Amino acid sequence: MSRVKKLHQWKERLRDRARTVSFGRFLWRRFLDDRLFQAAASLAYTTVFALVPLAIVVFGVLSAFPAFNEWKDALTDFIFTNFVPGAARSVQNYLNRSLEDLGKFTVAGMVALVASLLITLHSIEQTFNSIWRVAAARPKVTRFLIYWTVLTLGTMLAAASMAMAAYVFALPLFRTTEGQWLAEFAWRLAPMAVEFICIVLIYRVVPQHVVRLRHALPGALLAVILMEIVKWGFGVYLGNFQTYQRIYGALSALPILLLWIYLSWVSVLLGASLASSMAAFRYQPEAMRLPTGFEIYGLLRLLGRFRQARIHGEGLDEDRILALEPMLTDTLMQELLCELKRMRLLRRDERGQWLLARDLDLVPLAELYENCQLRVPIEDRPLPCRDDAYGQAAAAALEQLRQPLRSVLAQPVGDLYTHLPGDPP
């Protein structure tokens, strides 16, 4: 192997190592910024209060279809057997009693139950939007339709899957010794498969953001692994330490259930943070990084791209924006898009593409400066992509803005106070 090839290989390895280290730092910063443990604690409390209304909706949907009515108990047993610690299994009896007493609920009680469910679903959506750095939530009607669709179709698909599995495993193929072993293996694998599929769907549907499958799959895999570790840890603790029963007595199921829900949310949110980080991370060489304080340069370039797209009658999606402007990070791009949307300078169409909503010839720079609150840098710095048409236009605008500031800011601070009352002549 020639020295040139060896040198090229080492350069590739160093670049990959730098990319890996950069992604690790980026992922850690996202974990800290997302404050996932606090978010999981909040969701755990709201989820506990939403268990009864959620069960009412789920089993109410099944009751509306006689074909699925016989699978209600089987679905409940499957959920509590595979996804709830044994010490909290008594919660199943409480839910069953609540469902039996459903006819005794008053209108006010039903309104309170539905409100608690909607609050929980709204909190979940807000948390996922925060993880994916989405500032604008869905319209209320759209949000309600998505909630209802997920709950109803998800319930029907779960019951249909159990019915189909029961039919398949009843075939003569699974009556043999090998077939019984295969069926038993499939039933053991089913909880993890259900977890994985549900989490992937949550990542794809809940955020007001286009989450690609290649990002959702690793995040869901991490979440499932963490949840299986939590299950194993719970099994070890509950099987060897019974102190919690002596402390809480008959109420021991409640703290166990609350802790279980909290750790489950931690697992799901950590997986979501990984998925969003994989989508947002972009390895930028030093020469392609936007210097701190020069965000206005990126903003002017971005508006130039939208102006050009409008001339051609096109919109820009977020992937296209990042491809055209490699100096923008995903976080900065989301912030700029959110601010421009708030100014009603941009709008989003039904395909998720961003479009100019106003003529830039009628938008003064002062409006951008006041609303976006970006500083005008005084000193000149090497800027990425400065030599193309957009870079030249943005750099020229910055130079015009900074020229009058330089002379004003060059004067000493003490000169501002030369004419105060009481100063010596």
Curated annotation (Swiss-Prot):
The chain crosses the membrane at residues 48-68, 105-125, 154-174, 182-202, 219-239, 250-270. Belongs to the UPF0761 family. HAMAP family: UPF0761 (MF_00672). InterPro entries: UPF0761_bac, Virul_fac_BrkB. GO terms for cellular component: plasma membrane. This is UPF0761 membrane protein XOO3615. The lineage of its organism: Bacteria, Pseudomonadati, Pseudomonadota, Gammaproteobacteria, Lysobacterales. Keywords: Cell inner membrane, Cell membrane, Membrane, Transmembrane, Transmembrane helix. It holds the Pfam family Virul_fac_BrkB. It is a multi-pass membrane protein. It is found in: Cell inner membrane.
